[in-house]
Design a protein with these regions (language model features):
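Residues that mark the N-terminal boundary/hinge immediately upstream of a DNA-recognition element
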Residues: 4, 15, 41-44, 55
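Short alpha-helical DNA-recognition segment
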Residues: 13-32
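DNA major-groove recognition helix of helix-turn-helix/homeodomain DNA-binding modules
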Residues: 24, 43-58
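Alpha-helical residues within the helix-turn-helix
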Residues: 10, 21, 50
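A short, Lys/Arg-rich alpha-helix, primarily the initiator
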Residues: 1-11
């Protein structure tokens, strides 16, 4: 997962500080997610999925399709 969040960030040409500011955290704290030093909390996973317009399953490596899921019709 840490490689996916790094690759997504780099694809946008963003630095760690920019993503950390979006997440309202320090660059050092965010860096630990990308290196795998710290686990990524669910709340941060949700925020990253929203930021990168992808699914949590993609971030977790459960699918190779980066497209977000379609909402289930009610």
């Amino acid at each position: 997962m840490n490689l996916r969040i790094r690759d997504l960030r780099e694809d946008k040409d963003w630095n760690q500080t920019q993503v950390a500011e979006y997440l309202n955290m320090s660059q050092t704290g965010y860096s630990k997610y990308e290196t795998g030093e710290n686990d990524v909390p669910v709340s941060v996973l949700c925020a990253l999925a929203d930021l990168y317009q992808t699914s949590i399953d993609y971030l977790l490596g459960r699918t190779n399709n980066p497209e977000p899921y379609e909402p289930i019709p009610k």
